């Protein structure tokens, strides 16, 4: 079984999936969402969960640097509750402080153009979040 990693934004949802052994995370795709209209890409997530045999979902939890919860962290908590209800799978909130920055640095180091970075940053951030979670399980 595999673990799904998600990086929730206001307009996009970064998606990553683990290998079957739960050792490595790969960025999968970025789903366009509209949180204001309540569109969280659940239909596409259902297809991914079924296709990859996902048994656990990890959602990035963007705490403030001092550990407190701001509006984005609270949005992630609501999203996690929605996922639990929709998919009946364990959902783990995982501290994602600086994950997008780490993904951005990796892409810059790989000499990826700014235009291409914009297209892949969310799925890369999801992969960073998921890899951190997977590493903690070893």
Curated annotation (Swiss-Prot):
One of its GO terms (cellular component) is cytosol. One of its GO terms (biological process) is rRNA 5'-end processing. It is found in: Cytoplasm. InterPro entries: RNaseH-like_sf, YqgF, YqgF/RNaseH-like_dom, YqgF/RNaseH-like_dom_sf. It comes from the Bacteria. Gene3D superfamilies: YqgF/RNase H-like domain. GO terms for molecular function: nuclease activity. Its EC number is 3.1.-.-. Its main location: cytoplasm. Keywords: Cytoplasm, Hydrolase, Nuclease, Ribosome biogenesis. Belongs to the YqgF nuclease family. Could be a nuclease involved in processing of the 5'-end of pre-16S rRNA. This is Putative pre-16S rRNA nuclease. It comes from Geobacillus kaustophilus (strain HTA426). The lineage of its organism: Bacteria, Bacillati, Bacillota, Bacilli, Bacillales.
């Amino acid at each position: 079984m595999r673990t799904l990693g998600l990086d929730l934004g206001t307009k996009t949802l970064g998606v990553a999936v683990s290998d079957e052994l739960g050792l490595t995370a790969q960025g999968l795709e970025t789903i366009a969402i509209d949180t204001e209209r309540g569109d969280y890409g659940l239909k596409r997530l259902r297809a991914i969960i079924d296709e990859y045999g996902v048994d656990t979902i990890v959602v990035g939890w963007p705490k403030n640097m001092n550990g407190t919860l701001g509006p984005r962290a609270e949005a992630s908590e609501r999203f996690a509750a929605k996922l639990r209800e929709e998919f009946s799978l364990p959902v783990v909130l995982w501290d994602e402080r600086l994950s997008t920055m780490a993904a951005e640095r990796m892409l810059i180091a790989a000499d990826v153009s700014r235009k291409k970075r914009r297209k892949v940053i969310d799925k890369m951030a999801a992969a960073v979040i998921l890899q951190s979670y997977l590493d903690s399980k070893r």
